[in-house]
Amino acid sequence: MNSYDKTTPESVIQSDLILMVSKIFATDLTIWRNNTGAAFDREGRMIKFGVKGQADISGIMKPLGTRIEIEVKRPGGKQRPEQKQYGQMIKDHGGVYLLCDGDIIKQVIEPLRERLERDRKVIR
């Protein structure tokens, strides 16, 4: 298990999380990093990419096609209001929204395992 502190870049936690989740849930879950941001076109106009408040990592889980969203923060990091709103929207639509600030096992692996078992019971 990796140890993270406030100086650990979110990108390091994201990469570790994606590797761990991909190995543990190899046949049940596909996840990917969301790239958001902004750039300027040739005329100098700003073009924004992504959805406001969108989580850092998205995915889809078998057997029901459950939407997965994972917001990653450094230890002690706080969500912005639009991130909380996005998370609530995902939950309201039956998806899974998780916040991870470094404890990948407790904050991501365990909740995904529980949801996978629940979803499997639904189709039995």
Region locations from a protein language model:
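Catalytic phosphate/metal-binding cores of nucleic-acid and nucleotide-processing enzymes, i.e., regions
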Residues: 1-124
